Amino acid sequence: MPWRNQLEPQALAGHFAAHPPQGFAVLQGLPVPAFAAPLDLLTTADEGLKARVRALPLFARWSRWLRVRTGFVGTTVTEYAPLPATGATPEALAQAVRTGPGRRFALAIIKDLPQQSPLLSEADNDYAQAVAQACEAQGFVLVEGQALAYVPIDFSSIAEYLARLSASRRQNLRRKLRSRDGLVVRHLATGEAFAQDAAVDAYYALYEAVYAQSEVHFDRLTRDFFAAVLRDASSGGIAFEYRHAGTGDLLGWNLCYVHGGRLVDKYIGLAYPAAREANLYFVSWMENLEYALAQGLTHYVAGWTDPEVKRSLGARFTFTRHAVYVRQPVLRALARRFAGRFESDRQWRDQAGAA
């Protein structure tokens, strides 16, 4: 079935359904992809609220009650919620979620609804807006989501891109990029290059390293998922691989997709501390921009994490929102009152705009 809001190949959502993250279960019976998963209620809370809650007496004993089994509409492998291209009105979709997962789970969430995204068509943006309005009319609480970073490829050379950064940022970036001389970079198409289990194992180990040091632990993707996506030759996937020029050791990789005329950055694996010492975050950023420019692509879509760093590198941002249905009416009223405390990226945007 075709979906709206697709920035990546539809095959990714298929691999997600076949190999869901650890502790996740795919839900059936809706006209859109859906899953159930445990949600830590503090995941997107602002730092002040987190600190106050964690300082409460006996937090370690009762904190497990903050993890709630939740029904989600969407996936964790698509930038936006895949919504139906045909057949379901916004009102019918909202009702299906409210009377399905909304009754089965304490929380039901339509995640990652776009908000007038410059990366989507007018029709897709209008449908997402109509879904949000239909949800609000049926008792959902709308909560601001994360900041999706992107860079329009509206420059003719990397020199022109760098000229748009401040002098101090250009100097800092050039200093970090000197480590490129000690690296061997390869572009590997997904498919045959990952036929051997050892190749998948090496990539998955570096994904696990990134997951282990991440502040937010929501979806832990499985080795089976990575085996499927890395071996999918039809998806348009490209692994940017970074090895030490002297030893040949794998220091990191970055899995991207060319789709809809854009380069979409999806997954990364890093070998710590060597990857940090080689400044792979910044090296891979420039490698991806150079690739998108050389291929005549329109955008580099850079994902959700580290918005402040990406802002310093010239990224722009488009925001999502989540439609949250709370089954218990009293808690629903509380959720509406305190929703703003769970919009950490919106608070970052407001602070950045005021700076």
Residue ranges and their predicted role:
Residues 1-355:
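N-acyltransferase acceptor-side catalytic subdomain
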